[in-house]
């Protein structure tokens, strides 16, 4: 939990991978808690290249959304972003959490290839050395996944709260410094002491 807290406190992105339908409710609630710092992959299977070939996958998805908005009349030509710029954007999470690692070995391998730390619920049928942070528990149980995701997402939520508090303290400090700079300097007194 401290890993997730530290990542969200430093404005990191957490990717949650769970490809079984019974895991979707716990994944959705965890992503809602993490807000903009949490994303999920809960399709039927892991799509190869989500991490290693993200620029190509994201470029086509972005182009599709821009094209669909243009056909619906929601998007004007002058507001269309540069497509070459969108295709160079990459997606790289700071942590990948895998809820069912036996079905998502490719996701773990791809994250390892991209040097992204992985965290997974590890049962006796999975090698714990395949992930960076192993959580020893039953990876087949949706209740265990719900419990683990609840703990991890609340830790991430706490990290976001800490980040907000630190940013507010920094902003308050900066405003205080700015106010001191704007105050006129005291005039030296004419009488000797």
Region locations from a protein language model:
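Internal, active-site/partner-interface "lid" segment
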Residues: 158-193
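Ribosome large-subunit tunnel/peptidyl-transferase-proximal elements
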Residues: 1-168
